[in-house]
């Protein structure tokens, strides 16, 4: 592992344990086993490290989305994939993405850091809301809107559909964070949730 990657890993470990605001560059350098001046050869500041962590997370997410043949951010293109998926296929995709958010080291620790910091740092509170609520709801409501327009789903309010779909999944994710021993039980609920949602809103045989 190269030094830049070691710095990111050490920084994220510290951020997730102490919160972003309570970690200093010297601590990160010490955790890596280098001096602070050496760290600055790789990253200009703590914020630069933070931004690099976000970029690493995006890369990880994009790789995971690609394994499912979706973009993961573009509702227009992904609606085609979801419209052709069976109920079992949607459950499989849901499990894959849920497992990624739950177990990917960067994503898991970053979420923990944001949970800590959301009540102390307004900027990070906004980032938390954007990443785990606003962006997800926008993406999902976009997909539901397109599927309703094509007569695949029934429903006249894609935003409410997105709330109904996303909120239980986010709740299950946070419960798994707090009580990892319940993962099997909670992922069973995830499957039931996806299947019930599909059956409530599906109009055709694909979904």
Region roles according to the model:
Residues 126, 130, 134, 144-195:
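Hydrophobic/aromatic-rich alpha-helical bundle segments in the mid-to-C-terminal region
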Residues 102-115, 119-149:
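Amphipathic alpha-helical packing segments from all-alpha helical-bundle domains
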Residues 199-207:
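C-terminal effector-binding regulatory domain of bacterial HTH transcription factors
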Residues 10, 14, 56, 96, ...:
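Amphipathic alpha-helical interface segments
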Residues 52, 65-104, 161-162:
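Hydrophobic alpha-helical connector segments
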Residues 46, 53, 57, 61, ...:
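Hydrophobic/aromatic residues within well-ordered alpha-helical segments
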